């Protein structure tokens, strides 16, 4: 493992499998009466969020606290950033406080890389989402969910997703989740297909390690997992499709379309979902939908990432003693 986690593309196959295997052990903590390990006791982790977040911020905070880290939550609103303070000044302030790791979400693509390589701060940096660029821990938790469902919890240990067929549907253009998943799933040996209207595909997508299709119905019968992506209107300044109804008709997943998928196939969504647009309530509430599992798995993945970045060399959680209740 490198010192930072900035992009899913930076991970080797062995790195990714190590994280997934470590997360499998971290998941056992959730079954304990006391959901806590002493692994990062005495370490300080800062959640540096310049962009609104619910799931990711809470997930990281839960992961940090379960590892016994000291947690500092920073949001741009109400801080000196709202008064014009730069990322450099903020980083140097955190450096002066002696933090060990920074989890950063930023609207500017490349901000986590800048923080990690600038020399402003001597700490591990984890990218929690930067603009439309990358969201590596989301890709890892998605791959973790796929491996658990498609290979098995115990059977999946040490294994990747070789030969699995994954379909990503929706707003690829504005999605850091799509980019991260394509990078990681390719590294893990999966075959990825993107399905979207031409207006929601980025320039240069033909160079990505995946296939591109405009026909969802022809792709579904060949998919082991289908991941639906929200249309990110907050990043749009023009009309990318005629109407929501037309988009849903061509690219939304309903019960009839889900029936075309293989019996073992799963439906995924990184959240937040827009029911009635990219996914119907029937599909979202079905047993094949893994949205809630993804949230649960996100905590385990982020525990694994923090553990490995801050000194862990191998999956050793099963040998660690839980903190005794006082």
UniProtKB/Swiss-Prot annotation:
Binding positions for L-aspartate per the UniProt entry: 83, 176, 230
GO function terms (MF aspect): amino acid binding; aspartate carbamoyltransferase activity
Pfam families found in the cross-reference section: OTCace, OTCace_N
Superkingdom of origin: Bacteria
EC top class, as a word: transferase
GO process annotations (BP): 'de novo' pyrimidine nucleobase biosynthetic process; 'de novo' UMP biosynthetic process; amino acid metabolic process
UniProt keyword terms in alphabetical order: Pyrimidine biosynthesis, Transferase
NCBIfam families: asp_carb_tr, PRK00856.1
Name of the featured protein: Aspartate carbamoyltransferase catalytic subunit
Organism, scientific name: Streptomyces coelicolor (strain ATCC BAA-471 / A3(2) / M145)
Primary gene name: pyrB
